[in-house]
Amino acid sequence: NLFNSLARIGSCENAGDADCRPTIIANTPQELRTQLQSIIRQIIAEKLAFTAPSITATIQEGGSLYQAQFEYIQFGEWQGSIFRSELRPDKEVIQGLDHEGNWSSAVSLREQILESSSGGTNDDGRNIWTVLPNISYLGNWNNFTTDDANQDAINSLMGRLNFSLLDYHNSSSECSTSNRGTNHPSPLGADVGQDGTADEVAGLINFIRGQDYFDYDGDCVINELRSHIQGDIYHSQLIEIGAPDASTQFTDNNQEGYFRMVNGYTNFKLQNKSRTNIIYAGSNSGVLHAINASTGREEWAFVPPFIAAKLPIAINPLFDGRGPNGEGGSNAMFGVDGSPVVHDVLMRGLDSQGELEDDPTWHTILFIPYGRGGSGFSVLDVTNPIVEPSRGPLHLFSVYNDYIRKIVYIADEEGNITERAYVTNSVNVE
């Protein structure tokens, strides 16, 4: 038709050329914005290149050196990992995964999933959680799943910031039955050409959990484990949190050391002296990883609610079958891209059951800015960093500033979201 002809003239010389672009069809302003963003991200992906893995963050703790690295992927999520290397007293660094005690978080994560699923169960061994209204994460810290109620709540969350879900797999896409004989050898996975975006919601959830929803390997099996799962850790600096160690020394009563001393911080240190050391790092897959500093295994992963709302950005139908052998792809995005900050705070916080305490107690609070992932942040209580049936990390609140629509979104401890419109140059918080 006329529009397809105009699209062809504006993008390529001859019909059928690899750089030809289809007509943009959008039914709403939000869908048009998402479509245009997908095209812009495709153009950037085609022009961008890195020649080698990049080291983006380094911390030194005791006898360990931790380094975050990522590798650029042109039409997909960039691949990241944290490497632990032994650091000897003479400052010699012993690298290599064959050295005892060294690990790669990306390798450990994939092994963790394979070990958990080897018994034929659907358990992938991960605790991935967020905050959803009326769906508590307490007890298992694993509500970022495709269970009906969870998926419906996550779907509602994805529409909160006006990002539209695009239909990646449909009746005419690369992995549909209509393309089987032409573009792919047999045998192949089940037909995944479902029209509509219900499968995209489940697909994004499963992609976060490690499945190959976008068919990176081109075999049209979209429920298999990807060869690499952890997203890139780019601007987010690593932080290690173990036993509380803030100072109680002071020279006058206006110092924080004095405040700690007179308010029972020493008892808090004693009660948590054996607390497991955890590496916290934000990745652009959209999660905050909590990684055991000794083993490299992921203890849990938190998807901030306002980052979950932006996950539709990853979908780009223009990457469907974009690879030389029909491989699919997705947009690289900024997720949890800020650097976590920790502090021990005396306050009326939440108890292990998520209820407000009667009196102030000490808590280890983790502040998680989104960085380039968006103008927002989440605040967690990581006093108890290991998931157990009766205790674990707690969400306190999250905030997102939509400076385009002039709205501040606030998610409370249970995931209930309120909207506050700008008032002149301030925000109404009453």
Region roles according to the model:
Residues N1-E430:
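A fold-level detector for beta-propeller and closely related beta-sheet-rich head/sensor domains
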